[in-house]
């Protein structure tokens, strides 16, 4: 099956990406090795030159007609590959003449100049223009959102020029590598996609701006965790099978690499021991009470995530791994080229200190290893702090699981006695009671706990429960009643004897005891909260470190936004030079404009139609980036407009002005603000905010006037905008252009005008059989009525034209009287119905036109 053009472009793009990754790696290699192995590079360079000459001009032409994310990326990639290939070739030629590794790397990496800054000039009118400085991918994304907000007041030629500049800046920032450089993006700055993701999840009472703070963006630069090098060491061993037989010491280096990370840490090994103990029990086995408690505590230790898992890597292991890989590489290099490798990483190690080298990482170790090392060092720093140790020891889950495991390891002679898990826990609590906690409270707590477990478990633990209760000396069952009564009597006697020796007020309230209880409760609460905060801090910093150090690919968001904006500007300019578009300004004059306005100015819109018309105003005021109204499950137009305003950073009072404009009004005298032939002419505006409000009012007049026109004349005109492709089923099209802001599709023809009401007059009137377009005579309303009645120039759309049976002079001598109050059923309205004199008799209307 033959591939189509899109599939062929995808294949070309895939091969170019493959070569781009290889070329990016060659920039960091030893130039001596490159000169020795230059044949594949020259062959690929010749292929890139051919593709650049053959495909690049066609891709550029395609993007100036209709762009897509693929064609824009291919245009950017082909030009970058052509430039970088030529640059590397020149650097290799210069190195062959004068070997200087530092000069070679400065040339291929462009270290002597900085071209990653650009200033964009935006001109809206002769008096409104701005300069915006861009330096990162986040700046480009935010600037594109602002361009979307001012899409309607930006000329298409200026918009296309700005998009071309942004594409050039993207090429300079990203280069040929799919891996984003750390200096071209800011990980803590959110984007439009982050905003949209947060709008569809529960906010839990927090505002959107507050939730965006501290969020790591994964759309401008997409995080891709890299694989661990120790996992791939087997692949390396398979690749070096031929060299292992010829280089004896390689086998020892490979075996040392494989065994380096085999040892695992025993930190918190009781968790694994608990899981091993739980595997012996299932649904059909007797479950002792201690096993149920162990399962319960293990579950809570997992879900609450209060146990720190130590990362099994040390800085010594990483250093040894780096040295072993360096020895492996140099051994292969000496065998193949007769000298050690001296690439940019070897040169860089000499210029970095210990901490900088740790964050830069190793060329042999995956970034995940560096992240694990930093996390391990952070946890170790906390562990060295006595406060953290106290918090860790106060962890209730840790204590319970540890002592239950100790109880399981301890042999029981007959399954009874005080060595069960309850007895152990109560024994520990008894020791705590000696420092201020009452034994009575602990005994009551244990009896409640034991009764709860006895209700849940029916097998294997009854005797242990009974023995535990007897050991304590108090229980809930009748068997232990005597012991409980005796213990209570002894305690009461001791308390009475002790209270007789002190002040009588102590019988009412034991202040010292209450202080101790409250102090321990407060310390326990502080310990739990503090420990949780420490764990959350470590996890947050680990995510941030992963974003900083791990691999981040350039996301498609910026190119997607540029493609949508370019297509919008291209659609707006495609009818500029079309000779088939008729300008109605050459056919009609101010009289026709005034005719339509006078027939609409005294009418009013139904109040119930304003919400739907407001949605149409939002649709026409919005740009092409946020169009969720076309999704499978569409959102309303005001939601799209809210997304556009929030991502552009519009101030709240400006949003309020937009909402008031979109709410509309039913009276035409309040929305008819555009002068004759002045639609979308903002040359008098001196400020961007004023310019934007004027644009909103022009859009409001378009929507409400067309709606009133449909209501008055019985028409069904629909409105579209040139934000995407031209709608063949719409009648009035808003182009946002100053020269021809409005188009009318009518009877197979396309008309343009700078005045809305001339287009409405064009739609209302139709050419007669001779092909002459009628014009409204300059006369009084009564004369215009008579002329329209006689001439028959206007007719209803679905009724054939018939000559009038009445002579033209018959209307002159008819006396004026009040029209009868009887109303006819509304039919398709004609100009004659509107132009009829209010006080004229109904017999004036010819029968053929009634």
From Swiss-Prot:
This protein's encoding gene: TRM1
Keywords assigned: ATP-binding, Host nucleus, Late protein, Metal-binding, Nucleotide-binding, Viral genome packaging, Viral release from host cell, Zinc, Zinc-finger
Main location: host cell
Gene Ontology molecular functions: ATP binding; zinc ion binding
Function, in words: Component of the molecular motor that translocates viral genomic DNA in empty capsid during DNA packaging. Forms a tripartite terminase complex together with TRM2 and TRM3 in the host cytoplasm. Once the complex reaches the host nucleus, it interacts with the capsid portal vertex. This portal forms a ring in which genomic DNA is translocated into the capsid. TRM1 carries an endonuclease activity that plays an important role for the cleavage of concatemeric viral DNA into unit length genomes.
Pfam families, alphabetized: PRTP (PF01366)
Source organism, top-level taxon: Viruses
UniProt keyword annotation of Nucleotide-binding present: yes
Name of the featured protein: Tripartite terminase subunit 1
Biological-process GO terms, alphabetical: viral DNA genome packaging
């Amino acid at each position: 099956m033959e591939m189509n053009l899109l599939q062929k472009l995808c294949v070309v793009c895939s091969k170019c990406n493959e070569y781009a990754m290889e070329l990016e790696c060659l920039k960091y290699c030893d130039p001596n090795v490159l000169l020795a192995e230059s044949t594949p590079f020259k062959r690929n360079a010749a292929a890139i030159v051919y593709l650049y000459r053959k495909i690049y001009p066609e891709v550029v032409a395609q993007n100036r007609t209709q762009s897509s994310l693929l064609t824009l990326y291919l245009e950017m990639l082909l030009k970058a590959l052509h430039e970088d290939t030529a640059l590397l070739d020149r650097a290799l030629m210069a190195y062959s003449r004068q070997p200087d590794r530092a000069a070679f790397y400065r040339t291929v990496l462009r270290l002597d100049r900085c071209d990653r800054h650009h200033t964009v000039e935006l001109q809206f009118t002769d008096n409104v223009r701005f300069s915006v400085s861009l330096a990162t991918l986040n700046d480009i994304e935010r600037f594109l959102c602002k361009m979307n907000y001012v899409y309607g007041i930006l000329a298409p030629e200026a918009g296309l020029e700005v998009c071309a500049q942004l594409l050039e800046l993207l090429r300079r920032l990203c280069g040929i590598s799919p891996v984003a450089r750390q200096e071209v993006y800011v990980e803590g700055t959110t984007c439009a996609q982050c905003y949209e993701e947060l709008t569809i999840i529960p906010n839990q009472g927090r505002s959107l701006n507050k939730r965006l703070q501290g969020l790591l963006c994964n759309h401008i630069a997409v995080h891709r965790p890299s694989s661990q090098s120790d996992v791939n060491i087997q692949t390396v061993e398979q690749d070096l099978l031929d060299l292992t037989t010829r280089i004896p010491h390689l086998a020892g280096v490979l075996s040392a690499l494989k065994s380096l990370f085999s040892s695992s840490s025993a930190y918190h090994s009781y968790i694994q021991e608990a899981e091993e103990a739980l595997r012996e029990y299932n649904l059909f086995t007797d479950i002792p009470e201690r096993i149920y408690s162990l399962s319960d505590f293990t579950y809570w230790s997992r879900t609450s995530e209060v146990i720190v898992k130590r990362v099994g890597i040390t800085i010594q292991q990483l250093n040894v791994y780096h040295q072993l890989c360096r020895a492996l590489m140099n051994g292969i290099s000496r065998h193949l080229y007769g000298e050690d490798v001296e690439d940019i990483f070897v040169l860089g190690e000499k210029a970095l200190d210990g901490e900088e080298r740790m964050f830069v990482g190793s060329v042999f170790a995956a970034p995940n290893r560096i992240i694990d090392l930093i996390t391990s060092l952070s946890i170790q720093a906390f562990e060295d702090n006595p406060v953290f140790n106290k918090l860790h020891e106060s962890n209730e889950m840790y204590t319970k699981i540890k002592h239950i495991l100790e109880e399981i390891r301890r042999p029981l002679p007959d399954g009874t006695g005080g060595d069960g898990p309850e007895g152990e826990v109560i024994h520990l609590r008894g020791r705590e009671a000696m420092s201020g906690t009452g034994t009575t409270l602990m005994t009551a707590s244990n009896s409640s706990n034991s009764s709860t477990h006895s209700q849940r478990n029916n097998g294997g633990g009854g005797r242990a429960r009974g023995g535990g209760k007897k050991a304590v000396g108090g229980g809930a069952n009748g068997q232990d009643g005597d012991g409980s009564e005796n213990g209570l009597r002894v305690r009461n006697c001791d308390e009475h004897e002790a209270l007789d020796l002190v002040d009588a007020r102590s019988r009412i309230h034991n202040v010292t005891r209450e202080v101790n209880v409250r102090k321990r409760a407060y310390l326990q609460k502080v310990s739990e909260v503090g420990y949780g905060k420490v764990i959350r801090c470590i996890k947050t910093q680990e995510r941030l470190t992963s974003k900083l150090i791990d691999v981040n690919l350039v996301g498609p968001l910026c190119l997607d936004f540029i493609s949508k904006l370019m297509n919008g500007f291209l659609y707006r300019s495609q009818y500029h030079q079309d000779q088939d578009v008729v300008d109605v300004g050459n056919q009609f004059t101010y009289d026709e404009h005034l005719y339509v306005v006078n027939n609409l100015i005294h009418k009013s819109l139904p109040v119930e139609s304003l919400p739907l018309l407001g949605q149409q105003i939002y649709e026409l005021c919005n740009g092409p980036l946020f169009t969720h109204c076309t999704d499978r499950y569409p959102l309303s137009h005001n939601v799209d407009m809210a997304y556009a305003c929030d991502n552009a950073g519009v101030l709240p009072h400006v949003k309020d002005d937009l909402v008031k404009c979109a709410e509309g009004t039913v009276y035409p005298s309040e929305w008819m603000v555009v002068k004759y032939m002045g639609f979308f002419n903002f040359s008098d505006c001196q400020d961007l905010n004023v310019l934007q409000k004027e644009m909103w009012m022009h859009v409001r007049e378009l929507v409400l006037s067309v709606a009133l026109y449909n209501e008055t004349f019985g028409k069904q005109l629909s409105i579209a905008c040139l934000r995407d492709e031209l709608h063949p089923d719409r009648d009035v099209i808003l182009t946002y252009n100053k020269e021809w802001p409005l188009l009318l599709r009518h009877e197979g023809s396309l008309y343009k005008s700078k005045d809305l009401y001339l287009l409405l007059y064009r739609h209302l009137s139709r050419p007669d059989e001779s092909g002459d377009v009628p014009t409204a005579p300059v006369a009084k309303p009564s004369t215009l009525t008579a002329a329209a009645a006689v001439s028959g120039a206007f007719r209803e759309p679905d009724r054939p034209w018939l000559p009038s049976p009445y002579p033209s002079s018959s209307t002159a001598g008819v006396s004026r009287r009040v029209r009868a109050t009887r109303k006819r059923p509304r039919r398709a309205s004609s100009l004659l119905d509107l132009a009829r004199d209010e006080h004229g008799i109904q017999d004036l209307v010819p029968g053929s036109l009634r």
